[in-house]
Amino acid sequence: RRNYHQGLLGSELSFDEKVKAYKINNIFKGDVWVNPQSPLLRPGLNINIGDYIKKINGNTLTKKYTPGHFLVNQSNDEVGLQVIKKNSKNRRTVTVKTIKDQKSLQYRDWVEYNKSYTHKHSKNKIGYIHIPDMGVHGFAEFHRHFLSEISYDGLIVDVRFNGGGHVSQLLLSKLARKRLGFDLTRWMGVEPYPVESPAGPMIAITNEFAGSDGDIFSHSWK
C-alpha cells in the first residue's frame, strides 16, 4: 500500500473568519543543532506568530480546505505560501521546505514550557526534568537537564508518557544519592558531597501512559 506523507509546517494554525486565512498561533522552535526547526523559521522569511497564511501553492485556503488538504504527499518538498503580515493587508509569497515529522519540535517546546513554568511559579526554587523513555533518548534527556536542575532547592521528575526501556536503575541510582555535606576545594570552590547529588526534596509525576520500565520507575519511586 502506498503511503502519502503529510507535509508539515511546524506550527499551530486556526482559521480566522474575518481575514479568511489561517492565523499562525504558534511556531515550534525545537532544537537547532539536532532536529529541524519549523520551516517558518527559515532565515529571511520574516514570518511571525500572528501572521496569516492565505494560500498554499496558489490554492486558496478556506475553513473546509485546510492547509492539510494541500500538503498531502508534500513532505520534505518546497511549497509556496502566500503570507499576510499581522495588522497589514500586504500579501507576499515565500517558499518553505516542509517537514515530515514535527513530534520532536513539539516535545522540546513542551519540556521547555514545563521547565520555565516550574521555575517561574516556584520563584526559581524548584527544578524540572522530563524523562521521555528509559532508552537512549531518555538517558540523554535526563543528563541534559540533570546537572543544572539538581542545584535547585527541590526537584520535579516527570515520567508521564514514558515509553519504557531499560535504564531506570541507572537513573534511580543517581537520583537516590543523598547529599551528606560539601567539599571546600582549592580551585573549584564548594562542591557537594557526593558530587551530582540532588540539593533537596524530590517528587515524581507519572500517569497511566508511563509503561514498562517507566512503570517500574514509578513503582520503585514509591
Regions found by a protein language model. Give the residues of each.
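Cleft-lining beta-strand/loop regions that shape enzyme active-site pockets
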Residues: 1-2, 26, 30-41, 54, ...
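Short, surface-exposed beta-strand/loop micro-motifs that present aromatic residues
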Residues: 9-14, 116-120
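Glycine-rich active-site/cofactor-binding loop and its immediate structural neighborhood
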Residues: 11-47
